[in-house]
């Protein structure tokens, strides 16, 4: 599914463009990723978020 609305992380404005019209920074998708209990990559995302190497 392609998201249309985007959000600027600097000034928190919403737009449909890839570049923020207010400050010129790159916009991001404001929606969280879809959750799945059978997610194979959850340990890697936790490792990346916390900055700790997990022993797998």
UniProtKB/Swiss-Prot annotation:
Entry GO CC: ribonucleoprotein complex
SUPFAM superfamilies tied to this protein: Nop10-like SnoRNP
Assigned keywords, A-Z: Ribonucleoprotein, Ribosome biogenesis, rRNA processing
Tagged with keyword Electron transport: no
Disulphide bridges: none
Gene Ontology terms: biological process: pseudouridine synthesis; rRNA processing
Family annotation (Gene3D superfamilies): H/ACA ribonucleoprotein complex, subunit Nop10 (2.20.28.40)
GO molecular function terms listed in the Swiss-Prot or TrEMBL record: snoRNA binding
InterPro entries linked to this entry: H/ACA_rnp_Nop10, H/ACA_rnp_Nop10_sf, Nop10_arc-typ
Superkingdom of origin: Archaea
Function description: Involved in ribosome biogenesis; more specifically in 18S rRNA pseudouridylation and in cleavage of pre-rRNA.
PANTHER family for the chain: H_ACA RIBONUCLEOPROTEIN COMPLEX SUBUNIT 3, RIBOSOME BIOGENESIS PROTEIN NOP10
Family listed: Belongs to the NOP10 family.
Protein name listed in UniProt: Ribosome biogenesis protein Nop10
Organism: Saccharolobus islandicus (strain L.S.2.15 / Lassen #1) (Sulfolobus islandicus)
Gene name for this UniProt entry: nop10
């Amino acid at each position: 599914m392609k998201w249309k609305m985007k959000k600027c992380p600097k000034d928190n404005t919403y737009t449909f463009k890839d570049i923020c019209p207010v400050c010129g920074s790159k916009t991001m998708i404001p929606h969280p990723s879809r959750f799945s209990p059978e997610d194979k990559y959850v340990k890697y995302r936790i490792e990346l978020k916390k900055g700790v190497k997990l022993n797998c």
